[in-house]
């Protein structure tokens, strides 16, 4: 994700339920919207990665309702954003122009008003919406919209990002539309949250401990080590993942 530039694509954030997709997307959006938030990041590498986008974007984030088409929902939400910022553009629901052409015109109007800013449009969860549209026989009419939103990110300051619990392209219930899915895939970059990522956050953010506290945990676990075959190989990981229990505080 950069501020404008060539060969840009939409962003698909992939992670199973509870892995923090919304938190990750929210973090990106907070920094992109306000450069002051960059200083709150504890990880130096994350700060370096996000420095180029800090404070460069305006953001509109929403959750999908399931009772309308994707294009109708997206244009309604973008229109709400445009109107709230006095940007002179109106989507015409009867227009014969392509999705891409309308998005291009919208961004031209946005940049006329805010030439030094980009626009992030973010949806928390896409997969359930697409599943329901597939069940009602409407998936194939939604995929061109996804393709157009991803393509609109190229050579503009528009960024479209959404969260999903698994890769859309490999979901079994969507394989009847495999050809169109491949075209959609070409317009997005995949950002996956792995199990190791979640474990790291838990250890470093939620269960962070001093070396003295870790030593107490190691001593406490020693009598139980023989009962678990893989405890020796994962002793450090287990110590990192144990919470700061009352036992530790009593020892201290």
How would you name each of these model-derived features?
Residues 2-11:
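Phosphate-binding P-loop
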Residues 11, 29-58, 85-101, 164, ...:
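Flexible phosphate/Mg2+-sensing switch loops adjacent to catalytic phosphate-binding sites
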Residues 18:
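Walker A (P-loop) phosphate-binding loop of P-loop NTPases
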Residues 21:
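Conserved lysine of the Walker
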Residues 24, 28:
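Hydrophobic positions on the alpha1 helix immediately C-terminal to the Walker A/P-loop
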Residues 47-68, 72, 148-252:
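Conserved P-loop NTPase catalytic core
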Residues 110-139:
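Conserved P-loop NTPase "ATPase switch" module shared by AAA+ and STAND
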């Amino acid at each position: 994700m950069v501020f404008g530039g060539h060969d840009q694509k939409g962003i698909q954030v992939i992670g199973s339920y509870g892995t923090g997709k919304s938190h990750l997307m929210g973090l990106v959006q907070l920094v992109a919207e306000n450069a002051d938030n960059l200083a709150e990041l504890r990880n130096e590498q994350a700060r370096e990665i996000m420095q180029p986008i800090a404070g460069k974007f305006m953001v509109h984030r929403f959750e999908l309702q399931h009772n309308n088409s994707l294009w109708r929902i997206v244009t309604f939400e973008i229109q709400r954003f445009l109107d709230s910022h006095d940007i002179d553009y109106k989507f015409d629901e009867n227009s014969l122009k392509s999705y891409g052409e309308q998005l291009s015109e919208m961004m031209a109007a946005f940049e006329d008003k805010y030439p030094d800013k980009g626009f992030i449009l973010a949806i928390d969860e896409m997969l359930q919406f697409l599943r329901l549209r597939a069940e009602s026989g409407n998936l194939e009419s939604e995929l061109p919209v996804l393709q157009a939103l991803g393509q609109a990110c190229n050579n503009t300051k528009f960024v479209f990002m959404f969260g999903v619990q698994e890769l859309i392209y490999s979901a079994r219930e969507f394989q009847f539309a495999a050809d169109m899915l491949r075209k959609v895939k070409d317009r997005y970059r995949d950002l996956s949250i792995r199990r190791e990522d979640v474990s790291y956050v838990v250890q470093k953010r939620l269960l962070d401990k001093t070396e003295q506290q870790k030593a107490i945990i190691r001593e406490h676990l020693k009598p139980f080590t023989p009962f678990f075959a893989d405890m020796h190989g994962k002793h450090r990981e287990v110590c990192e993942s144990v919470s700061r229990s009352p036992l530790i505080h009593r020892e201290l």
